[in-house]
Amino acid sequence: MAKQGMLIVLSGPSGVGKGTVRKEIFDSDDNDFQYSVSMTTRQMRPGEVDGKDYYFVSKEEFEDEIKSGGMLEYAKYVDNYYGTPLKYIKQSLAAGKDVFLEIEVNGAMQVREKMPDGVFIFLTPPDLMELKHRIIGRGTDDMSVINKRMAKAVDEIKMMRNYDYAVINDEVPLAAERIKAIIRSERFSVKRVMPEYEEMLGDAES
């Protein structure tokens, strides 16, 4: 039986730097897992690439995927849909590949219900003032949207207790290294290693 891959879920409030930290992890030479590209209906930001950062689709296309059961999770956030296509995740995990998701907090909680064996990591800002500076620094939102994001961020940070790990994003390279250390440790946890030994012991006893 092929070893099942591990699902790694990174989420946190808007503006905390999830995408930046994820890029830092995947740009390093020692990353050996696959990134599952999320789907969204929001506008593409400068520097983003369709199919690499997100699949950018229309609202109608996204809702068609929901109706057909093609989404592992999805959420509507500040008037835009975000979600994770299911097919790629299932295929990769079944092939023994570790899969990395970078998703919104509500989506992560949906995944937790469906795939509780995943590794759930909450990326948090050093403080709320720094988070507001980061959102303003994007230059993509007006103050009404920024205020919505900040109110939502407070609610999302309260949900940190539902995660396995919390990582402070004070400096991007440090946050990336902390996450990689968590993943390395999880690969050697008893709950992930034991199924292989149970199969081996079963073969020895037969």
Swiss-Prot record:
<feature type="binding site">
    <location>
        <begin position="12"/>
        <end position="19"/>
    </location>
    <ligand>
        <name>ATP</name>
    </ligand>
</feature>
<feature type="domain" description="Guanylate kinase-like">
    <location>
        <begin position="5"/>
        <end position="184"/>
    </location>
</feature>
<comment type="similarity">
    <text>Belongs to the guanylate kinase family.</text>
</comment>
<comment type="function">
    <text>Essential for recycling GMP and indirectly, cGMP.</text>
</comment>
<dbReference type="GO" id="GO:0005829">
    <property type="term" value="C:cytosol"/>
</dbReference>
<protein>
    <recommendedName>
        <fullName>Guanylate kinase</fullName>
        <ecNumber>2.7.4.8</ecNumber>
    </recommendedName>
</protein>
<dbReference type="InterPro" id="IPR027417">
    <property type="entry name" value="P-loop_NTPase"/>
</dbReference>
<dbReference type="InterPro" id="IPR017665">
    <property type="entry name" value="Guanylate_kinase"/>
</dbReference>
<keyword id="KW-0418">Kinase</keyword>
<dbReference type="GO" id="GO:0004385">
    <property type="term" value="F:guanylate kinase activity"/>
</dbReference>
<dbReference type="Pfam" id="PF00625">
    <property type="entry name" value="Guanylate_kin"/>
</dbReference>
<dbReference type="GO" id="GO:0005524">
    <property type="term" value="F:ATP binding"/>
</dbReference>
<keyword id="KW-0963">Cytoplasm</keyword>
<keyword id="KW-0547">Nucleotide-binding</keyword>
<keyword id="KW-0067">ATP-binding</keyword>
<dbReference type="InterPro" id="IPR008144">
    <property type="entry name" value="Guanylate_kin-like_dom"/>
</dbReference>
<dbReference type="InterPro" id="IPR020590">
    <property type="entry name" value="Guanylate_kinase_CS"/>
</dbReference>
<keyword id="KW-0808">Transferase</keyword>
<dbReference type="InterPro" id="IPR008145">
    <property type="entry name" value="GK/Ca_channel_bsu"/>
</dbReference>
